[in-house]
């Protein structure tokens, strides 16, 4: 990108597309893009130095502003559908993270997948932390982190957890 007075507005030399699998989180995508950038940067520098680069103006009508994500935006609303909740978990990993509050403690869900259980939004459906969502589907937590503790796989976490089947995790 050529430098322009405004941030991220200059013409670009090359753009690349990548395939994103559904289960990738923000950290995975960042790593994938870093590897692509490392692979392509020398070719792009050569094009510029050899005066072969073709710079194209960006389409500013499709540009969007991305404000900083606040920590509280990571709070999970169990009334949402399972796919949106999984998107929040993946999109906010590793930081600020998607979380819920149970008995006054914050729990960050690090990895989850869509499950088949049904129940009231926020209801714990199994002993392995399957949580009901607002669309009669659920999410199965795979990895979780209790506030101030190390990340844990769900089986290990549930051994000492106060969260049990039938508990309700509210949106409050």
What are these regions (language model features)?
Residues 1-65, 72:
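Donor/substrate-binding cores of folate-linked one-carbon enzymes
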Residues 9, 64-68, 96, 108-110:
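Short acidic/glycine-rich loop or secondary-structure boundary segments that cap or lie
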Residues 31, 43, 67, 87, ...:
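Charged/polar, solvent-exposed surface patches and flexible loops
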Residues 67-80:
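Acyl-group handling in specialized metabolite and lipid biosynthesis
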Residues 79-172:
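An anion-binding loop in the catalytic cleft
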């Amino acid at each position: 990108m050529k430098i322009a007075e405004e941030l991220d507005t200059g013409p670009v030399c090359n753009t690349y597309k990548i395939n994103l699998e559904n289960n990738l989180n923000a950290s995975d995508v960042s790593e994938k893009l870093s590897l692509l950038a490392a692979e392509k940067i020398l070719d792009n520098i050569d094009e510029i130095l050899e005066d072969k680069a073709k710079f194209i103006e960006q389409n500013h009508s499709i540009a969007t502003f991305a404000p900083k994500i606040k920590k509280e935006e990571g709070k999970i609303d169990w009334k949402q559908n399972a796919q949106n909740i999984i998107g929040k978990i993946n999109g906010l990993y590793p930081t600020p993270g998607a979380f819920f509050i149970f008995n006054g403690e914050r729990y960050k869900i690090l990895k989850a997948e869509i499950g088949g259980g049904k129940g009231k939004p926020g209801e714990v459906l199994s002993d392995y932390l399957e949580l009901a969502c607002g669309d009669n589907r659920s999410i199965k937590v795979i990895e979780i982190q209790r506030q101030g503790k190390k990340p844990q796989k769900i089986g290990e976490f549930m051994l000492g957890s106060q969260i049990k089947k039938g508990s309700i995790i509210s949106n409050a």
